[in-house]
């Protein structure tokens, strides 16, 4: 009985750990797009940068 309990605990921990790693990757992608958006916004405030990156500023 203890062996079955131990196997269930280990299996659950493994699944939880794997799901946590996958969500961290998603957060990294979201953070990267947020940084890109902030760069684009700041760039559009600077005339020289705005001229060089017209596709971002419209």
Curated annotation (Swiss-Prot):
- Where does the secretion signal sit in this chain? 1-16
UniProt key word Protein biosynthesis = no
InterPro entries according to UniProt: Conotoxin_a-typ
- Region listing for Lacks the Ser-Xaa-Pro motif that is crucial for potent interaction with nAChR, in residue ranges: 45-47
Changing residue 50 to A has the effect of:
Little loss in inhibition
Q: Where in the cell is it found?
A: Secreted
Entry's family note: Belongs to the conotoxin A superfamily.
| General function of this protein | Allosteric inhibitor of alpha-1B adrenergic receptors (ADRA1B). Binds to an allosteric modulatory site on transmembrane helix 6 and 7 at the base of extracellular loop 3 of ADRA1B. Also weakly inhibits alpha-1A (ADRA1A) and alpha-1D (ADRA1D) adrenergic receptors in a competitive manner. Potently inhibits contractions of vas deferens, spleen and aorta in response to noradrenaline. May also inhibits nicotinic acetylcholine receptors with a possible distinct nAChR binding mode from other alpha-conotoxins, due to a different three residue motif (lacks the Ser-Xaa-Pro motif).
Q: What is this protein called?
A: Rho-conotoxin TIA
What species is given as this protein's source? Answer: Conus tulipa
Taxonomic lineage is: Eukaryota, Metazoa, Spiralia, Lophotrochozoa, Mollusca
